[in-house]
Amino acid sequence: MSLISALANVHHQGQFGDFEDKKGDDLLKISEKKNLLIVQIVQFKNSNIPIESIDIDGLKLKDSPLNVSFNDNTRILWNGPKNWLLVSSKKDLINDISLTFKETDFAVTDLSHSRAVIDIEGNHVIEVLKKGSPFNFDELKKNNSINSLYNNIAFTVDLLNDKPFKVRLFALRSFGESLYHSITDAALEFGYENK
């Protein structure tokens, strides 16, 4: 059995919108990110385990707003008080996570197949996000993440880089195509290339 990506029916390679005479970072690049391990980790209220003692792929959980812990393979996004979203290219990390987080203290949920993941890169990324979201993206810094809405679709934004801008967007798989259409529609003005 093969898996079908969340955007398989709508994401097609090519250049769209006002792409003529644009090169490098002036042309937005939009791609679907596949084959990621996505795990939600929530610490129970009655748990006494100090999160500072927990290590996953060399990273610590941090309970501070907007914070992202990261290395080359894994990013841990703060999702709320005692709530994190772990995203990794190392699919076998799920075994370590299962051993590290005891069921009596943490709820661990594999969300890998229930999310649509879109990467957007280029100089106009923030302008595209501003078109559909009420969040003030001018205040978002590199390696910060937020939860917000984009045209009434709940999504998570992870700012991977700021020179040039690169963001990773996460939405429920069932809203993936709608989010994708909203993002690509907003990107037409700047021109974009699907990879």
Where are these regions (language model features)?
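Basic, glycine/lysine-rich polyanion-binding surfaces/domains
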Residues: M1-K195
